[in-house]
């Protein structure tokens, strides 16, 4: 049996809501419904009664619940033990490409410079979309996630690392937003919710990317503009803020599992400043 089906069943039984379960699992609601149907087909029974705003476990669902909890607990314990033997000196850090390029690359260098207390530790810098990294974190395939969004699941611990400033940059001075093509650099779903009000509701991105380096290199060729961290843009040089734009403050969080066996190590590593400019 696919453990992902059991995990989805447990989340729906906990939230009693397909939409909230989908949000917690970082899935679409249709994906959650499909997984539940798969599990019901495998077992040959209905697990939930479905009425609008009223999802309840059936008698079969109630019987499955303790077994599902035990199976998932055993599976997680097994994964933890196996992972511990193979990753004793490894420490994986996940983030988007833009975060690695603009700030975490420097932090990784500081971690190596301050490694006396953790000699022999092998770091893995993992680049992926946030949704994929959250899943890896939940499944103990990732030790630490650095992101611009606070965690949404109770089993995660988090620490606010500070804030960084974004500004709208282009390659030439004295440019207005209306004169430029927009390049969308992904800074998280919550950033995109406010994006239309910042660049114009009808503005369609000419390019979308998760890489700050790529976006910065394309600005001049595409007569474009994009949101970049101010401190990083100043170091790069050759970039100019768009005249009729504003600046934005973005938070940076470290997220890890509450019951991680590397809790002490994580807190020690986070004592080394992640951001060059913390405020």
UniProtKB/Swiss-Prot annotation:
Residues 1-58 form the HTH lysR-type domain. Keywords: DNA-binding, Repressor, Transcription, Transcription regulation. GO terms for molecular function: DNA binding; DNA-binding transcription factor activity. Transmembrane segments: none annotated. Pfam families: HTH_1 (PF00126), LysR_substrate (PF03466). PROSITE patterns: HTH_LYSR (PS50931). Residues 18-37 bind DNA. One of its GO terms (biological process) is negative regulation of DNA-templated transcription. Negatively regulates the transcription of the flagellar master operon flhDC by binding to the upstream region of the operon. Belongs to the LysR transcriptional regulatory family. NCBIfam families: PRK03601.1. HAMAP family: HTH_type_HdfR (MF_01233). This is HTH-type transcriptional regulator HdfR.
